């Protein structure tokens, strides 16, 4: 936001940001931890099922349990730090400081990305068994609503705002998917049973050493 933005709009946006910051501190980390055990329970169940069925892909699931148990709390803790940062820069954001706008968008992107990542393991393991609404959607929403409130609060052309919304939305989707794909690539490359021998079919490139 800039000083050209009306006082009423700035107060509204700051209110949304402060509410999000509080939720990032008191809600997001605990909800992130709460999702871990249900996912791990069904992951371990599927691993045992694959072993009984002699499914050769079971080793690729073994690292998934460790990755989920690390990255869910990791994103929760990062959200806490981002929430504290938002509280610290709220006055500067209200005053229209350019650096505060960029930093606030960065902080709000953390629960947005983390929540988007958390949706997939939940749906694959818990949702496929129990159904229901993924709690990670709420985590993602905590970041997304204030993110776009800050981004679109400036006075400007409606068409430009639509473009900004779509571009930044796709940037967020790309960032979250890149993290999720890196998560999957890691467990596949490091989980194959013949490691450190390169698994059959893995392309040898300049970065092939990353698969060892």
Regions found by a protein language model. Give the residues of each.
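Topology signature of small-to-medium multi-pass alpha-helical membrane proteins
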Residues: 2-212
């Amino acid at each position: 936001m800039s000083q050209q933005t009306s006082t009423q709009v700035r107060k509204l946006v700051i209110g949304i940001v402060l509410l999000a910051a509080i939720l990032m501190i008191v809600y997001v980390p605990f909800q992130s931890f709460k999702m871990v055990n249900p996912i791990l329970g069904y992951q371990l169940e599927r691993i045992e099922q694959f072993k009984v069925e002699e499914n050769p892909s079971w080793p690729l699931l073994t690292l998934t349990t460790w990755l989920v148990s690390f990255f869910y709390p990791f994103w929760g803790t990062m959200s806490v730090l981002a929430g504290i940062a938002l509280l610290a820069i709220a006055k500067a954001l209200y005053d229209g400081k350019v650096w505060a706008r960029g930093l606030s968008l960065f902080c709000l992107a953390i629960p947005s990305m983390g929540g988007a990542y958390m949706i997939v393991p939940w749906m694959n393991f818990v949702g496929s068994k129990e159904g229901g609404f993924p709690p990670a959607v709420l985590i993602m929403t905590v970041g997304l609503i204030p993110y776009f409130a800050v981004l679109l609060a400036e006075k400007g052309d409606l068409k430009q705002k639509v473009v900004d919304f779509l571009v930044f939305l796709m940037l967020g989707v790309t960032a979250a998917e890149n993290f999720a794909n890196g998560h999957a690539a890691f467990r596949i490359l490091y989980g194959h049973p013949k490691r450190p021998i390169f698994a059959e079919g893995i392309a040898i490139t300049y970065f092939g050493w990353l698969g060892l």
